[in-house]
Amino acid sequence: MNKLEEHYIVPKDVVAELDKYIIGQDEAKKLVSIALVNRYIRSRLPKEIKDEVMPKNIIMIGSTGIGKTEIARRLSKLIKAPFIKVEATKYTEVGYVGRDVESMVRDLMSIAVNMVKEEMYSTVRDDALVRTEERIVDSLFKGSSNSENMDPNEIKAEEKVKEKLRKKLRAGELDDTTIEIQISSKMPFSTIEIFTGGNFEEIDMGIGGLLGNIFDRKKKRELKIKKAKEIILAEELEKLVDHENISDIAKSKVENMGIIFIDEIDKIAAKNRSGNDVSREGVQRDILPIIEGSKVNTKYGIVDTSHILFIAAGAFNLAKPSDLIPELQGRFPIKVELKSLSIDDLKKILKQTKNSLIKQYVAMFKVYDLDLKFSEEAIDRIAELTFNMNLESENLGARRLHGVMEIVLADLFFEVPGSKLKKFEINLDYVNKKIQINEQKDLNYYII
């Protein structure tokens, strides 16, 4: 992880990180890692060449639940890049009621702004906590308000009392104490909603900045210290961060590191030129300029999409990538087909990934002080059952594991809370018993 954080990245390092969370799909992981590293290489090029190097956008082909979204999401987390997943079917052609395609860029920019804010908050959090503590202690302490007229002994005595209050505050002993504090009460005038081009859009009119001083009034409130700490800390964090740079840093992150994942791209692939297919083609033509590179107005400024990485995905059961308009196909030079999950893949997903499904359930039962274990035979049976159901009905990939696990563990979730049970093993017989009980029902109906 250190290499990734320091940006000394090579494709093998990226794949090694993805392997911790995603089973199989080696070809897809390899191609997205190359695309990521090439973006890093671009950032090191001279400006005249850098501007000419375009991102190698990717189309992932495969059914649901096999890792398409997770690969892109984990990739963005590794490099702390702004990431958004959108569904192609949610957008409409310009002139129709619905979301316009530029909103995906506006949403990505909002995500980036929040990311930058959180990064800035982390650097000033310690100072903000000290300030928060002092404000609460001052509210609690009823001593003199003018230290200039106090003699040294009085000042020392006051500081001793304050230090005792600080210790109690840090220990949580004062959480239920009620205090009166002054908090900011700003009027929410930063954005307004207007109706334009068949869409509701949020437009920043800058009113918050113009009238901020008028409507930023202080008001007194009585709150328990636990709640007051949250409010005061948020205020102090806002005071300490450099708001002028947030939008600029976020814009740079979006333009150079942003990732937009367009799911269900196959649903807007037009196989003929009539009826709904014409509308779908219209959405494709609206998406095209954004992928090619265009300037999009957001409430944080104009964003250039030329170097955003676009990853599209779809099952392509009823359509083929070649059914997309040729211009859009050309903007996705890399196409990779993800494989359906085997029984062995499902076993590994259950127990080998960093935050595997079994680890999650074991942790949940640990809250009830129950040590839950799964035998290897039980894991094999759960994987086999999931695989067979994916063959017999719609292939949901790893997502079906959740449904199977819930059926197997339903009685435990009901019985364990409040019981004295400390240890329990899920074995093959237990899994078969739970499955047989439910076989009288249509498992394909109940397990999704």
From Swiss-Prot:
Query: Do the record's keywords include Chaperone?
Result: yes
The source's domain of life comes to: Bacteria
Q: Which GO terms describe its biological process?
A: protein unfolding; proteolysis involved in protein catabolic process
Q: What is its main location?
A: cytoplasm
Q: What are the alphabetically sorted keywords of the record?
A: ATP-binding, Chaperone, Cytoplasm, Nucleotide-binding
Annotated SMART domains: AAA, ClpB_D2-small
Intracellular or extracellular location(s)? Cytoplasm
Residues reported to bind ATP: 23, 65-70, 263, 327, 399
The entry lists its GO molecular-function terms as: ATP binding; ATP hydrolysis activity; peptidase activity; proteasome-activating activity
Q: Name one GO cellular component term.
A: cytosol
Please name the PANTHER family in this protein's record. ATP-DEPENDENT CLP PROTEASE ATP-BINDING SUBUNIT CLPX-LIKE, MITOCHONDRIAL-RELATED (PTHR48102), ATP-DEPENDENT PROTEASE ATPASE SUBUNIT HSLU (PTHR48102:SF3)
Subunit structure, as described in the record: A double ring-shaped homohexamer of HslV is capped on each side by a ring-shaped HslU homohexamer. The assembly of the HslU/HslV complex is dependent on binding of ATP.
Belongs to which family? Belongs to the ClpX chaperone family. HslU subfamily.
Q: What does this protein do?
A: ATPase subunit of a proteasome-like degradation complex; this subunit has chaperone activity. The binding of ATP and its subsequent hydrolysis by HslU are essential for unfolding of protein substrates subsequently hydrolyzed by HslV. HslU recognizes the N-terminal part of its protein substrates and unfolds these before they are guided to HslV for hydrolysis.
> Can you say what this protein is called?
ATP-dependent protease ATPase subunit HslU
Organism source for this protein?
Borreliella burgdorferi (strain ATCC 35210 / DSM 4680 / CIP 102532 / B31) (Borrelia burgdorferi)
